[in-house]
Amino acid sequence: MRTHYCGDLRSEHIDQTVTLYGWVDRRRDHGGVIFIDLRDRTGIVQIVSDPQRTPDSYNDADASRSEYVVKIVGKVSARQEGAKNPKLPTGEVEIYADTIEILNGVHKQLPILVSSSADGDQVKEDLRLKYRYLDLRRETMAKNLQLRHTVVKSMRRFLEDDENFMEVETPILTRSTPEGARDYLVPSRVNPGDWYALPQSPQLFKQLLMVAGCDRYYQIARCFRDEDLRADRQPEFTQLDMEMSFMSFDEIIDLNERLICRIFQDAQGIELERPFPRITYAESMEKYGCDRPDTRFGLELVNVSDIVADMGFKVFSGAVKSGGQVKVLPIPNGNDAISNVRIKPGGDLFNAAVEMGAKGLAFIRVREDGAIDTIGAIKDNLSDAQKQELLSRTGAEAGTLLLFGAGATDIVNKSLDRVRQLVGAEMGLINENQLNFVWVTDFPMFEYNSDEKRLEALHHPFTAPNPEDLEDLATARALAYDIVLNGIEIGGGSLRIYQREVQEKVFQTIGLSETEAQEKFGFLLEAFEYGTPPHGGIAYGLDRLVMLMAQEDSIRDVIAFPKTQQASCLLTDAPAGVDQKQLKELFVASTAPEKD
């Protein structure tokens, strides 16, 4: 029976006899003495097989190779002074093997090098995903899975032991509802022609749990969305889902800050300062051009629409007159850091802005003598008074580069936000070890969907409006809050609607007829007739949170068996075709074109 894990052995275990199981990470033969680095999910420890000292272990030690599965029984010994390895937590000890038993070997050439000395990160991701069971043996991936486990354990302990939450499972097979991304649909065999949907979130069920009196609910919930994938998206993902009755806006935020602080303390020994800063949606869009600001660095946007509104340069004045904006991204020392080539057509910053919908980037460079360099059309139409006001408002000093966005407000914001991120990273303004949390509040209830020519809920249609704005729901602020870490949203929630008449008004505002609302959400509306308590909640993207904590670039590196950006599993070759008999039982016929 195993007595210890490899990575747990320390000086206090010296002279103890231990039984270990694991994989051979490396094997080295030094003049007849064989050294094996034995690896399990906790780390590596050095095994010594000396034919003079422990002859019974030598033959199997000699026969072992990388990734062989072995059992080791031996005595923990102190390494000699010159042989200690400060890079390993177990580096002060080694195990002299009394017996080594090979439990299984490797019968094919390894498609991925697993050893801690190999640079596994350089292996193509497709190969890593195809042989994920080997990829997960690597030290980095094993640590990521352990971190994820520790985070979830911390969440559970805080919510259950400290805050009296109940963990309740909600259905995976439910009904399709409007709003949000496309659903994954499941045909019903026993109800031909009817379909289930896999849940995009447990939203409605957790609100019904509040009606039921389960006043503090949480769940580590699996969720599904059939949408185009990015680096931080998966078709199936995991949330920490929470809902609470009888708590105010500020009380919910306070509880969640304490939760986040506990997670970072338990998982990484990091003490966070609270309360976290708060910023309104309007302020975030104005200063950062987005609703998920990265506050680790400055470079805040400055609105100069009023200064250039009457300017002869039509790109600026025309944008303002058509209802748009002109904003500036001031970059101190930008003259030296950023050449004209990069902000003119074909340059990387120019292209980044264009990808976000902008037509280009106008610029002004402030010289050492206070004069400006820019294109003639700006210089010829900028009065001295406008120039001075522009430099004063942006705080521009000698050496500052001013980059302008002009046009529709959303395009100006998106393009300058993108350029700001690129410049901040390139100029070394971002401390990768810094953790900047910020709450974004006072979101609009609705945004306009130009394709469908209607309002739609910015978050979801169950978010409570600010009581001060009930007279005009179309322009109301929501009692919503997003928590952002280093420019990435890790969670979001709101106080909920709990009165039928308010919920019906919201449905009307987003264009749902009374019949449609009753058909799709009648069960919720009826529940609101039976004494529904005030409530609110939040959901965290567990994958994104762990990705940030592990300082990985993709959530695929913190998920055991992720899908590719084409929503496929290279390990199991899913999705795949099914037998026609199965389709017939489900009364489903495929209209997809035949594969080549």
From Swiss-Prot:
Gene3D superfamilies, per the entry: Bira Bifunctional Protein, Domain 2, GAD-like domain, Nucleic acid-binding proteins
One GO term (biological process): aspartyl-tRNA aminoacylation
One GO CC term on file: cytoplasm
Site (Important for tRNA non-discrimination): H30, G82
Superkingdom of source: Bacteria
Subunit field text: Homodimer.
Name this protein carries in UniProt: Aspartate--tRNA(Asp/Asn) ligase
Taxonomic source organism: Picosynechococcus sp. (strain ATCC 27264 / PCC 7002 / PR-6)
Source taxonomy: Bacteria, Bacillati, Cyanobacteriota, Cyanophyceae, Oscillatoriophycideae
